[in-house]
Amino acid sequence: MSRIPIADPDIGERERERVADVLDSGQLADGPVVREFEDEFADYCGAAHGVATANGTAALQTALEAAGIGAGDTVVTTPLSFVSSANAIRLCGARPVFADIDERTYTLDPDAVEAIVAARDDVAAILPVHLYGLPAEMGRLADIAREYDLALIEDAAQAHGATYEGASVGTLGDAACFSFYPTKNMTTGEGGMVVTDDRGIADRAARFVNHGRADADEHGYQHVSVGHNLRLTSLAGGLGLAQLRKLPTYNARRRANAERLSAGLADVPEVTLPTEPAGRRHVYHQYTIRCTDRSALRSHLDDGGVDTAVYYPTLIPDQPAYDGFDPAVPTARRVVDEVVSLPVHPGLTDADVETVVAAVADHYGRPDAEVSADD
């Protein structure tokens, strides 16, 4: 029995050509193809500057460092995300403070954020995560950041091409961070990017990922600050350029698959479907439903050849590395036990989508659920 995977990276001839071009050039590390990728990805987002990084976690730490976040600061973020969202804060010497989430969108609840910010005098930044491909409530969060003079750093690792009120994620705060891990909406294998309209942040980020190097002397080895080696390779940059050309098509297919899944599951009341609030464009890095019998549903789908995943089974503050963090996040604690993601990637055929719908419906004793040919 062939299985329907939860993710299926699409690497084609154009990607192979781009990688071969880099190999032929002999510039395998931080070459001109990386500068080209930075420029094109920033332009895609509508941002002025792009700084490529080795991975998405590096992008987060780089953006925070470039925004001046460090020891003595706290950063408000979500408890429901991959652990890197909080790890990057701690790697800067700052401390994450976890605010609760909205029950419909699973992104930061602005009211919870404002309550924390108003009660503390050490908050320096807000780091919202555009979870599963849906932008957070950036209008309210931007208002809070302005009122309290805070940095606003977007974790857009799962949201390439998503928009909020017509503006692309990546342009909704002081800086934004993307990941190009293989399961993301586009991939470079491993890789990340910081995008920003702030030239100062861009310059500091570029130095931070390259040993604090300014290249201001005749030998090219002037280091004006302490940094890391977090550069993206040229091989990854070549992959990124090829993948970026396909991203609009990938996202359109993800959205079409999501619409068909939602249409087919609309009459299965045991599951809560993803939402797309007015003014926000979801790019469905994940199609995440909620149910109260997650293990049983996953087992049934596994028996039927449908892969699923849980993003994420444990809240960040409940991880062993976060012992001592005990935030009041009742909504997140309820949601974390119920979320499960179904296949939605662009490699799915219409028949695959129908199989997923049928398997979920069958588990709940609703075998008549189907995807309409008109959807």
Residue ranges, per PLM feature:
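N-terminal "arm"/small-domain region of PLP-dependent enzymes with the aminotransferase-like
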Residues: 1-27, 32, 224, 304, ...
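A short hydrophobic/small-residue beta-strand
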Residues: 75-76, 89, 96, 152, ...
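Short beta-strand->loop structural element characteristic of the AMP-binding/adenylate-forming
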Residues: 95-105, 309-311
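Active-site phosphate-binding strand-loop segment of PLP-dependent enzymes
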Residues: 104-188, 193-195, 341
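PLP-dependent aminotransferase class I/II
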Residues: 47-48, 111, 125-128, 134, ...
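Phosphate-binding glycine-rich loop
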Residues: 27-74, 88-91, 98-100, 167
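Helix C-cap/helix->beta junction micro-motif
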Residues: 92, 147-148, 304
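Generic structural signal for small/hydrophobic residues in well-ordered secondary structure
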Residues: 19, 41, 59, 75, ...
